[in-house]
Amino acid sequence: MATAARQGMGLNPVTRSACIESMILRVSVVFGTALLLGCASAPARSGAPTDATPAALPASEGGPATAAVAPPPLRWPVRTVPHVDLWLHAFAMLSDDTASVPLYRRGYRDSITVLKNQRNLLTALDGNREVLRRGLQRGSYLDAQFLPFAYGSWDELRATAEQFLQWGGDVRRAPSREVAVRLQPFAALFPGSNDREWLRLFLTGVDDEGARFLLVEHQRQLRERAPTITAVDSLWQRVYRDKFERFLNNTGLRQGDLVLSLPIGGEGRTGPGYTGRVMVAVTYPARPADAAQVLYVFAHEATGALVGPAVSDNTTPAQQRAGVAAQFVSSGQVQAGAMLLARIAPELLDGYQRYYLAQSGQRVTGDVRALFDRTFTLPAIIREALARQIDIVLSGI
């Protein structure tokens, strides 16, 4: 990622997916320890994460009020996490996202800009956009997208960031080891005074954006999309979680949270969450009829870690230096999701291919599979390596 050419958000179409994979691995290392020390639970607050399925059954009618019995916890509940959306929304509004599979939902920034213009609304994030955008281009802040995963609310995230800034980024000033560990991800991402000044300005913008616009707008959209999350939850828990289960178990993903996120499109986010489980943030479709899009992006994310090794083992150092290998990673991540679905849920494959073609801006006509393979091209040797690896995972070897 350090050598990636900067473009808007900070990544060009060739290197963006390679950096995402590398980013996920680094974020897991940076945040893993922090999650073990005090981030695994958080009190419920206004705007706190919500689950699609209740955590406990109500008492039976006429029975004792205290007799409610909780069902076994869902291994992969479907959730929304407002402060994750707020944070990703802010990054999306600062980004010129021109990747072939956009880092955010296609057209997201433009749609929000139109909405705010209609309301004649200008927040601190808008007012400081150019300064923040230039800083984002210069700095290596892409990993900061994952910071909210480690916190149960915006208040907790903001308080930790403000502590970090108050102490000038010196984690040694923390009053305890636990606090120092919580500050360490910020120290890794914002080591210099210029980095911390960017973070200070960004926090101010995010806070104002949330208070004056996004959190209310977010709740409005969640109400409008309530039938969608119900459809997604039903499709996932009743049909497809079992189909994904073997792959998830054999890749260490037995427990997790499936987070529906409004700013996200075909490029999800995966990282350790404040629940102590992995969080996979995926797109939040507007219509119940599009609920399967969640499964498409989840398949893309679930297979992402297999792609880097398959590419690096089958490319030359010269190809890696020239950026060719990074391009193969980008295509490989899309192809790997298709390969997994072909094995565990072939009825989803055509929809998956159409979805990612649309994400890449392709007009879908004629032979969908041929167009998909041309758009996300891979050498046969890498394709075969990915297929073998997916077969190995599914066989439990």
Locations of the language-model features?
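Auxiliary, metal-adjacent structural segments of Zn-dependent hydrolase domains
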Residues: 214, 218-274, 347
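Post-HEXXH active-site segment of zinc metalloproteases
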Residues: 309-333
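Long, mid-chain structured domain cores
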Residues: 127-230
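Active-site recognition of the HExxH zinc-binding catalytic motif
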Residues: 292-312
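Pan-zinc metallopeptidase signature
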Residues: 349-397
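Active-site scaffold of zinc-dependent metalloenzymes
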Residues: 267-292
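N-terminal mature-domain "stem" immediately C-terminal to a signal peptide or N-terminal signal-anchor/transmembrane
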Residues: 49-168, 377, 381
